[in-house]
Amino acid sequence: MVTTLSYTERASHPSPLAKRLFSLMESKKTNLCASVDVRTTEELLKLVDTLGPYICLLKTHIDIIDDFSMESTVAPLLELSKEHNFLIFEDRKFADIGNTVKAQYAGGAFKIAQWADITNAHGVTGRGIVKGLKEAAQETTDEPRGLLMLAELSSKGSFAHGTYTEETVEIAKTDKDFCIGFIAQRDMGGREDGFDWIIMTPGVGLDDKGDSLGQQYRTVDEVVSGGCDIIIVGRGLFGKGRDPTVEGERYRKAGWDAYLKRYSAQ
């Protein structure tokens, strides 16, 4: 059964990161995550500054930024996150053994654990991936970090369903503080065992139904009523012919109204 608790009630979460996220969602009245996949630092920062007031979370693919640097990309991005009060989710989709992901998360060119509040991982390599990522976070920063497991995807033909999804949920159960939830298309349960997982859902659109590369879109009401806590929207916010200011408020309101409808159903 989908939870009808308010974000304020859920801010008693055992994870400091989840607690912070629920609190800012309530204070800003938004459950919108902007997925900003652009190729330059200038485009990224400009869009984030515009969308910042409407979002609780920014989702990045930092490895597609052609002119990336910690100084010119990450530093100003962190300043914008403070100015507009949102968290940062690096959509890295880790998928290797624990020792390897530990190095990938903490080091390399992107040093993700230093600046991203949240990251995510596939469950294909087993439980060691959670341990490796958590160790990297603890050894890199004193700031709280959170992990989302990829339980389901929005792309046509995805293998992330059935037994794979069930096993991924079992992996998430191994760490109540660090594993804060899932990338999924619906509620993942767990409340009977004391878990309050955050469900973030990609492939959400108010207008389009899909694209030529297999993306499939569902409506805001559809995903939130099914258990989604945070809607992830990309091209719907800033695609060709769209005004990010107008679309940011449009999706913020749609997401918040859908949440209030679910909450009022208790």
From Swiss-Prot:
Q: Which reaction does it catalyse?
A: orotidine 5'-phosphate + H(+) = UMP + CO2
Residues annotated as transmembrane: none
Name this polypeptide is given: Orotidine 5'-phosphate decarboxylase
Any one Gene Ontology BP term: 'de novo' UMP biosynthetic process
Pfam families the record matches: OMPdecase (PF00215)
Check the record and name the SUPFAM superfamilies matching this protein.
Ribulose-phoshate binding barrel
Q: Which UniProt keywords apply?
A: Decarboxylase, Lyase, Pyrimidine biosynthesis
Which domain of life, per UniProt?
Answer: Eukaryota
Record PROSITE patterns: OMPDECASE (PS00156)
Active site positions, chain numbering? K93 (proton donor)
Q: Report the SMART domains cross-referenced here.
A: OMPdecase (SM00934)
Q: In which pathway does it act?
A: Pyrimidine metabolism; UMP biosynthesis via de novo pathway; UMP from orotate: step 2/2
**Binding residues for substrate, per the UniProt record?**
37, 59-61, 91-100, 217, 235
Similarity annotation = Belongs to the OMP decarboxylase family.
EC number(s) given by UniProt: 4.1.1.23
Please tell me the species this chain comes from.
Answer: Cyberlindnera jadinii
Recorded GO molecular functions are: orotidine-5'-phosphate decarboxylase activity
GO cellular component term, pick one: cytosol
